[in-house]
C-alpha cells in the first residue's frame, strides 16, 4: 500500500518563530540538520523545507503530531543530493508496527514557501 503526505509552510513564518523561540531549532531539528541548513545560502528556506518534510512524513504515516518527537524524523541528503528520511526512536518503532518498507520524500522551496511530499510504502493494507 502507498500512502502520501504533503505539507507547505511559509518560510518567513518559521524564521519568525525561530527568532522568537531560539530553542525551537534544537526541539525540531537534529544537530546535523541544523548544521547543514545554517551553511546554506538561505538557511530559513532549507529549515522550512525540512520542517515541511517532517510534517509530510507524519501525515503519510498517519501518526499525526505528538506521536513521536520532531527529531525522530531526520531529513538528510544522499551523496547525489536526493533527500533521505531516517527514522529514529519512536518514529522508527511506529513505522515497524505499520509495516513501513520505504519512505521517499521530495522537497521544494521558492522565495516565500517551502513544501514537501512524502510517500510511504507499507506491506499492510486495510483489506488484510
Curated annotation (Swiss-Prot):
Do the record's keywords include Magnesium?
A: yes
Q: Which domain of life is it from?
A: Bacteria
| Pfam families assigned | ACPS (PF01648)
A GO molecular function assigned to this protein is: holo-[acyl-carrier-protein] synthase activity
Instruction: Tell me the HAMAP family matching this sequence.
Output: AcpS
Family per record: Belongs to the P-Pant transferase superfamily. AcpS family.
This protein is called Holo-[acyl-carrier-protein] synthase
Task: Report the source organism.
Answer: Moorella thermoacetica (strain ATCC 39073 / JCM 9320)
Gene, per the UniProt record: acpS
Amino acid at each position: 500500500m502507498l500512502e502520501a503526505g504533503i505539507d507547505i509552510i511559509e518560510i518567513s513564518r518559521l524564521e519568525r518563530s525561530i527568532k522568537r523561540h531560539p530553542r525551537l531549532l534544537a526541539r525540531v531539528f537534529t544537530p546535523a540538520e541544523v548544521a547543514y541548513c545554517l551553511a546554506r545560502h538561505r538557511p530559513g528556506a532549507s529549515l522550512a523545507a525540512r520542517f515541511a518534510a517532517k510534517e509530510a512524513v507524519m501525515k503519510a504515516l498517519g501518526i499525526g503530531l505528538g506521536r513521536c518527537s520532531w527529531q525522530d524524523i531526520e531529513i538528510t541528503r544522499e551523496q547525489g543530493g536526493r533527500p533521505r528520511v531516517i527514522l529514529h526512536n519512536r518514529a522508527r518503532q511506529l513505522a515497524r508496527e505499520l509495516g513501513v518498507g520505504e519512505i521517499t520524500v521530495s522537497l521544494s522551496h521558492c522565495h516565500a514557501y517551502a513544501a514537501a511530499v512524502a510517500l510511504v510504502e507499507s506491506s499492510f493494507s486495510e483489506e488484510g
